[in-house]
Amino acid sequence: MGLIYLDACLLTYAIEEHPLWADKVRAALESESDARFAISPLVKLECLVKPLKTGDIALQRRYEAGLNELLPLPMPETIFLQAAMLRACFGLKTPDTLHLAAAQHHGCTALLTNNDRLEQAGHGLVRNVLK
């Protein structure tokens, strides 16, 4: 059983019922039936901005319910230092490097995303499930 880190974009597609991507995200998650899915506080932040900004309480509750089903991973300072190195080496955006560093730090077997830029820096850890 592997530990799989989920990028916020995939949760957004699934929870908000994106017409093109929701079913593909669900299928990708279902194909990993023996895995434990994990997120960081950064994923929560990214997911909750829209419903908080728009005041959409129903959407906020859907996010909170979905996020609460996932394993929360802490983000100690070492993750931020690793993210700085990744940003310096690969030129990725700070949130992307934090996701990757968190997955690496916690020994995740995969980081699922739709972000092609992360694949090179991830050295096989990152999988774009929407290709």
Regions found by a protein language model. Give the residues of each.
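Acidic, PIN/NYN-like endoribonuclease modules and their adjacent C-terminal/linker elements
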Residues: 1-3, 70, 100-131
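Active-site charged/polar residues at nucleotide-handling catalytic sites that mediate phosphoryl
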Residues: 32, 90, 106
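Short, well-structured N-terminal submotif of metal-dependent ribonuclease cores
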Residues: 1-39, 51-62, 116, 130-131
